[in-house]
Structure formats: C-alpha cells, structure tokens
C-alpha cells in the first residue's frame, strides 16, 4: 500500500525526523489559506499522487507570493500529471501539499528496503539526492552505498556513522544524521513498511538536515495491525479493478496485454503468464482466485477482467488440489451466463474432480475451448485472440 508525501511526512514527524512545515489542500482556496497560515516568504506547491518524478512533470513548483500560490495551485489541481512512473496516461492531481521553502545547500538520498537475499534490511544511501536513484545507479553506481542491518541488533551508532561518512556528510552533520538514520530504521520496522525513502534529505547552509520528501510502501499483509496507516489509503490513486477485486479477496494486478487470466495459486498464475508470452501472447492481468474460490468469486473475477476493453480472450488454468475442478467449472458456467461472454474462453483443468469438471463444461452448451496442457491452452488462446 502506498501513501501520499504529506502523509509520509506526518509519520516521519511522529518518529522525530525533521520535516518542513506543510499543510495539505484540496482546493485553490485551501492552498491560499495554507500559504497564508505558513507565512512564507517562499512556499513549495506540490502535487500529491502515488508516483515519483513529479518535479520533472511540472507537479512541484516554487511560489514567492500568495498570488503565485493561487496561480500554481490552479494549474496543478486537476491536471493529468505524467511522470516516468505513471505511464503515458498520467494520474489526475486531486490534492496538493503547500510547504515551507527550504534553504538547500546539498541533497542526499536515503532509503530502507528488505533484502530477501540476505534476510536483512538494506539501508541504501547516496550523495546524489534530488534525482532518480535509478539514473544514479546506472550512470554512477559508485555513488551509492548499501549497508545491511541485522534485524536482531538494529542500526547501531557505528553503522550509522559509516553511512553518514560514506555519503560525504560533513562532521557538523554527523550526529544529527545518526539520529535521523536510527529513527528512520525504527519507523521502517514499527510501521511494517516495505520501503521508506527520503529523496532528498537536505543539508542547509548551517549543516542541519531535513527530509524534503517522503515515500512509503507498506506490507499489505501487516495492515491489519495498523489501522492508522489504513486510514491514509486513497482509493482514487489505485487501479479501480484492483480495488474491486480486493473486495472479493481476489489477488488482481492489471497488465497491458489482451488475454485475461484466471488461475488458482500465485506460482501457477506467474507460470501461466510466462507461457502465454512464450507462445506470442500478452497477459492482461494477474488474477489468483486462491484455494477457496466460489461460483460468486469466479463470476466477479470474470466481470472485473471484462471491464477492461482490451481483453479479447480469457484463459482459465486450474490445478485442483484444495480447490476442486467441479467447483471452478460451476463458477465458470455461471460467470459465462452472468456476463453474457462474447470473447473466446479456453479452460485447462487438472487435479481433484477433473473429469467431473470437464464433463460439466462440455455439457454446458457454452463455446468453451478445452485444453489438457498449459502449452496447448496458451497456444489456443493466443490463436483465438488474433
């Protein structure tokens, strides 16, 4: 789960990490009132969307007068902001963050992520803040340092000092950097975050440090114990199909292809998408109905897939372990009738009650294309959508 910058800064503030004063705004008038309350003399007007690269896309601008704030807020609110993370369609700006301007002397990058290979938390830092870290990694990888933190011991002072020295912070900033780094680590662990990123971490002319941006991702499996974080959720920023799928406990992710996929099990779903691509097709989604699918869930899955106008065919690939093939067959038949299916449908079933499931589909009177192997299923659906 992602949140907005201003929400992330509220979390950082609660953990003692210094951030500029700021006020969210949903209208131009609220933006003006926020600027007046902050007092100036310089403000930063920031678009709030769940994507990076806002500055390059025209979503972050400096204002030196209240009239500037009013004009810029009017320009940004409602715009379709396009960045390298939004795709060509962009994202509509529905809220702003009005923030005090900062005395920028030098910008740094810091982030924490879980490293699955080492089973530790990776603290990534760079002297090159304020720009895409991917670009830094590509052009000057030597300017990025990574420290692995043992979750049993946490981030100690010695390791934090090593990070500060590694990115070239002056001695005058080291003590504050150590304090910020340790608080960031505590924030990361206590909130069950999967990513905490500050880009940039600013050093001003007095060598004081402050987080000028905040990006958070949270482990959705841990949200049940963080009602305060769940309250930050902005459904307007999420894929409507994914939001709808979550209501029915369906694991759904939209993709760019034209073949809808309905599978039970995440691993089989990934293998199904790979097989479709292997035979020249493009999956339109990842969809795992899980081990407890019902006819209702299958019907809702079909409805969600078919709301995508790009979907020209559907592949159902089921391995009946806990999930019985006849249950899926019943769901597929009900779904086809409920949505008045008009695109090709290929179904491949293996496992528990396989013969009964196949018999039900064959006797349904519906134009369902049967397949026995994944390769055959992929070949048939790719051919059917061409």
Swiss-Prot record:
It catalyses: succinate + ATP + CoA = succinyl-CoA + ADP + phosphate; GTP + succinate + CoA = succinyl-CoA + GDP + phosphate. Residues 9-244 form the ATP-grasp domain. GO terms for cellular component: cytosol; succinate-CoA ligase complex. ATP binds at residues 46, 53-55, 99, 102, 107. Mg(2+) binds at residues 199, 213. It is an enzyme of class 6 (ligase). Transmembrane segments: none annotated. Its cofactor is Mg(2+). Pfam families: ATP-grasp_2, Ligase_CoA. One of its GO terms (biological process) is tricarboxylic acid cycle. GO terms for molecular function: ATP binding; magnesium ion binding; succinate-CoA ligase (ADP-forming) activity; succinate-CoA ligase (GDP-forming) activity. Its EC number is 6.2.1.5. Keywords: ATP-binding, Ligase, Magnesium, Metal-binding, Nucleotide-binding, Tricarboxylic acid cycle. The keyword Nucleotide-binding applies. Signal peptide: none annotated. Binds 1 Mg(2+) ion per subunit. Pathway: Carbohydrate metabolism; tricarboxylic acid cycle; succinate from succinyl-CoA (ligase route): step 1/1. InterPro entries: ATP-grasp, ATP-grasp_succ-CoA_synth-type, ATP_grasp_subdomain_1, Succ-CoA_synthase_bsu_CS, SUCC_ACL_C, Succ_CoA_ligase-like_bsu, Succinyl-CoA_synth-like. Belongs to the succinate/malate CoA ligase beta subunit family. NCBIfam families: PRK00696.1, sucCoAbeta. Heterotetramer of two alpha and two beta subunits. Succinyl-CoA synthetase functions in the citric acid cycle (TCA), coupling the hydrolysis of succinyl-CoA to the synthesis of either ATP or GTP and thus represents the only step of substrate-level phosphorylation in the TCA. The beta subunit provides nucleotide specificity of the enzyme and binds the substrate succinate, while the binding sites for coenzyme A and phosphate are found in the alpha subunit. This is Succinate--CoA ligase [ADP-forming] subunit beta.
